[in-house]
Swiss-Prot record:
Stated family: Belongs to the ATPase alpha/beta chains family.
Organism: Streptococcus pneumoniae serotype 19F (strain G54)
Subunit structure: F-type ATPases have 2 components, CF(1) - the catalytic core - and CF(0) - the membrane proton channel. CF(1) has five subunits: alpha(3), beta(3), gamma(1), delta(1), epsilon(1). CF(0) has three main subunits: a(1), b(2) and c(9-12). The alpha and beta chains form an alternating ring which encloses part of the gamma chain. CF(1) is attached to CF(0) by a central stalk formed by the gamma and epsilon chains, while a peripheral stalk is formed by the delta and b chains.
Reactions performed catalytically: ATP + H2O + 4 H(+)(in) = ADP + phosphate + 5 H(+)(out)
The keyword Transit peptide belongs to this UniProt entry's keyword annotation: no
The UniProt record lists the keyword Membrane: yes
One term under GO cellular component: plasma membrane
Subcellular location: Cell membrane
Gene (UniProt): atpA
Gene Ontology molecular function, alphabetical: ADP binding; ATP binding; proton-transporting ATP synthase activity, rotational mechanism
Topology with respect to the bilayer: Peripheral membrane protein
Predominant location category: membrane
Protein name (record): ATP synthase subunit alpha
Protein task: Produces ATP from ADP in the presence of a proton gradient across the membrane. The alpha chain is a regulatory subunit.
HAMAP family, per the entry: ATP_synth_alpha_bact
């Protein structure tokens, strides 16, 4: 067989021309310190802030402190197998979590991994946990109501879609109950709900999940949980995971309600991380950027413009106070970021007034424009009337004689307090709220004994369901009150048939 030198040289040239180097250049470093969910590594010269890093044992971390000699890293997940001297690699990516429809009805951890024992979550969509909030021109003003089903909120401190409304109060004053009831009331409202449990007992989270399942609310809800037993980095990350999942739906033109229960525990976890990373402590040992921790989270809740789909994220962040002190550091930070707050009073709760909303300290800065016309008409002055009743009630403790006008205000105030009480997990449709508040503000309840108000309301709603469903339908469809004469006649008919005369 003859060897053709030209053919061989042509083949070699072709091979050289088509050669593509197939190798990866990965920047690696060495772990120099490990402990308490924190690692330090040397040798990662070009790492970016917030970049995902891969440890030798398969765990991941996030770069936080970029210093001249080493990098401070928070570890996402188990750090018991990581040792000093282990290799750590850059990934060139930032932290992302799975998002999409397949997460609905599931309970996941802050990394998007299922913890409910129902198998893998199949989705190929991911979103970064840290993302810029919509800009000024990408937003719309809040114009649609978000009905919580709670008379005290929908009448006194209404919430609109795209609003951030802080729920603040001491422990055991009913904050979580308000959130769960609001989620239950979103059934058939074309709303997706995300409940983020931060630093709670696992038994408590289990109870909330079972409540949602029992009332059929898990069909439109995602639960993100970072329990008290998990490392601080996961507690810090949980709210950002929740809002990343919410953004996926918002940019599809859908409406989302997200509950952060509660941000006080996230702030404590962030303080812990910052102190371990040797960042300079400030007031109450919190780092200087603790305001930015919450502002960049809550600014991602918005009602976006029609060009971006017209979707919304409504946020209900919680803050736990100590002895009702709403002037504390984290509390005032979040109050200044949000569009209003609902303050739950310890004294009111213990007096059996539930939900224990303090009308004087609670406000909604944008929700009023989202109220339906009917509710605006019946509840216009209710919050001020209730706050003035509380003041008058304090004066009556001195035992002075009262004139007829003051006595009438006190009588109306006592009945208002009773009407605004509501049992747990029984949200009320807005049309029923409007009818009972109309009866209250137009004096139909002034002669009803205070002790009978709860029974009066039950029979009142039963009567309207059976005898005058068209009135409820009118309010539901037109968002406005029917003719006053029609409503007055229906309420008078009920009073004539009942034993409350």
């Amino acid at each position: 067989m003859a060897i053709n030198a030209q053919e061989i040289s042509a083949l070699i040239k072709q091979q050289i021309e088509n050669f593509k180097p197939n190798f990866d250049v990965t920047e690696t470093g060495v772990v120099t310190y490990i402990g308490d969910g924190i690692a330090r590594a040397h040798g990662l010269e070009n790492v970016m802030s917030g970049e995902l890093l891969n440890f030798e044992n398969g765990s991941y971390g996030m770069a936080q402190n970029l210093e001249s000699t080493d990098v401070g890293i928070i570890i996402l997940g188990d750090f018991t197998d990581i040792r000093e001297g282990d290799t750590i690699r850059r990934t060139g990516k930032i932290m992302e979590v799975p998002v999409g429809e397949s997460l609905i009805g599931r309970v996941v951890d802050p990394l998007g991994r299922p913890v409910d024992g129902l198998g893998e979550i199949h989705t190929d969509k991911t979103r970064p946990v840290e993302a810029p909030a919509p800009g000024v021109m990408q937003r719309k003003s809040v114009s649609e109501p978000l009905q919580t089903g709670l008379k005290a909120i929908d009448a006194l401190v209404p919430i609109g879609r795209g609003q951030r409304e802080l729920i603040i109060g001491d422990r055991q004053t009913g904050k979580t109950t308000i959130a769960i009831d609001t989620i239950l009331n979103q059934k058939d409202q074309d709303m997706i709900c995300i409940y983020v449990a931060i630093g709670q007992k696992e038994s408590t989270v289990r109870t909330q999940v079972e409540t949602l399942r029992q009332y059929g609310a898990l069909d439109y809800t995602i639960v993100v949980t970072a329990s008290a037993s998990q490392p601080s980095p996961l507690l810090f990350l949980a709210p950002y995971t929740g809002v990343a999942m919410a953004e996926e739906f918002m940019y599809q033109g859908k409406h989302v309600l997200i509950v952060y229960d509660d941000l006080s525990k996230q702030a404590v976890a962030y303080r812990e991380l910052s102190l371990l990373l040797r960042r300079p402590p400030g007031r109450e040992a919190f780092p200087g950027d603790v305001f930015y921790l919450h502002s960049r989270l809550l600014e991602r809740s918005a009602k976006v413009s029609d060009e971006l789909g017209g979707g919304s994220i409504t946020a209900l962040p919680f803050i736990e106070t100590q002895a009702g002190d709403i002037s504390a550091y984290i509390a005032t930070n979040v109050i200044s970021i949000t569009d209003g707050q609902i303050f739950l009073g310890d004294g009111l709760f213990n007096a059996g007034i539930r939900p224990a909303i303090d009308a004087g300290s609670s406000v909604s800065r944008v929700g009023g424009s989202a109220q339906i016309k009917a509710m605006k008409k019946v509840a216009g002055t209710l919050r001020i009337d209730l706050a003035s009743y509380r003041e008058l009630e304090a004066f009556t403790k001195f035992g002075s004689d009262l004139d007829a006008a003051t006595q009438a205000k006190l009588n109306r105030g006592r009945r208002t307090v009773e009407v605004l009480k509501q049992p747990v997990h029984k949200p009320l449709p807005v049309e029923k709220q409007v009818t009972i508040l109309y009866a209250l503000t137009h004096g139909f309840l002034d002669t009803v004994p205070v002790d009978d108000i709860v029974r009066f309301e039950e029979e009142f709603h039963t009567f309207f369901d059976a005898q005058h469903p068209e009135i409820l339908e009118t309010i539901r469809d037109t968002k406005d009150l029917p003719e006053e004469a029609v409503l007055d006649a229906a309420i008078t008919e009920f009073l004539n048939q009942s034993s409350f005369q």
